Design a protein with these regions (language model features):
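Hydrophobic/aromatic beta-strand patches that form the interior of the parallel beta-sheet core
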Residues: 6-8, 42-44, 62, 96, ...
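Cysteine-nucleophile active-site neighborhood
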Residues: 66-131
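Short, glycine/charged-enriched secondary-structure capping and boundary segments
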Residues: 20-23, 56-58, 75-78, 110-113, ...
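C-terminal and late-domain segments of enzyme folds
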Residues: 161-163, 169-242
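Flexible, glycine-rich phosphate/dinucleotide-binding loops
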Residues: 14, 50, 70, 104, ...
Length: 242
């Protein structure tokens, strides 16, 4: 099964820091391409108004993270993205949402996203899986991924199921039908990138937040495992919704 995957780039960070690293779309491709060398990936710059022509143009979609807020209707590209998510859902086409993408799916389909009263989730963070799915192989009851967010889903869309979370982020992952899967976290982020990000944010966030973030990096991120789950999700979704 050779699939064409659209990676929808929503990160609008144009800082000098961001320029030192591959963009978030490229990070997703670097994670998934080695796992499925015969698949093709195309990064589409949603932040510049580029979206697939219709929900069937690709075999699957990944929405990246972004420092933007899904609640910021002043941004001209947020509304069209939410409309596209609704179209993908109506067409039952496979979609994975990461961080901002997770939140965008929630808002597009009737859920709610708010600032986290506990502040920033930064560094590494766990997801304790309450439910497992066929694509989650090898199975693991708790996964750790990089986190960088101060907003999160507070109410899921009708019909969504929470697959896992934590005390800090109760709705850490959602499933909708057999075609949408989301996570609040960042499988595409490496330890090197997070260490650099913490350095960049050192004078922008409070000392307690930064200390917790640095300490959390003692917990290794399950990047290879989660990448495997992602490609297996697409394969499962294409089989279930051909």
């Amino acid at each position: 099964m050779s699939l064409r995957i659209a990676v929808l780039l929503t990160n609008d960070d144009t800082s000098a820091f961001a320029a030192h690293f591959p963009n978030d779309g490229q990070k997703v491709v670097q994670l998934l391409q080695p796992l499925r060398p015969d698949w093709s990936f195309e990064v589409l710059s949603v932040k510049d108004g580029v979206l697939p022509r219709d929900p069937h143009a690709f075999d699957g979609h990944v929405i990246t993270g972004s420092p933007a807020s899904v609640n910021d209707d002043v941004l001209p590209w947020v509304g069209p993205l939410l409309d596209f998510i609704r179209a993908v859902d109506a067409a039952r086409q496979p979609l994975i949402g990461l961080c901002f993408g997770h939140q965008a799916v929630a808002r597009a389909l009737g859920g709610q996203v708010k600032c986290n009263a506990a502040g920033w989730g930064l560094g590494t963070a766990p997801t304790h899986w309450q439910h497992t799915r066929p694509w989650m192989q090898p199975a693991q009851s708790t996964t750790t991924l990089m986190a960088a967010h101060n907003e999160q889903v507070t109410r899921m869309p009708e019909g969504a199921e929470c697959l896992g979370g934590s005390d800090f982020c109760p709705i850490g992952s959602m499933q909708i039908g057999q075609h949408i899967w989301t996570t609040q976290f960042h499988p595409e982020m490496s330890l090197v990138f997070m260490q650099a990000l913490l350095g960049y944010l050192a004078d922008k966030l409070d000392a307690d937040t930064m200390a917790r973030a640095h300490t959390s990096l003692n917990n290794a991120a399950d990047v290879p495992l989660f990448g495997q789950w992602m490609v297996q999700f697409f394969e499962n979704a294409r089989t279930t919704n051909p």
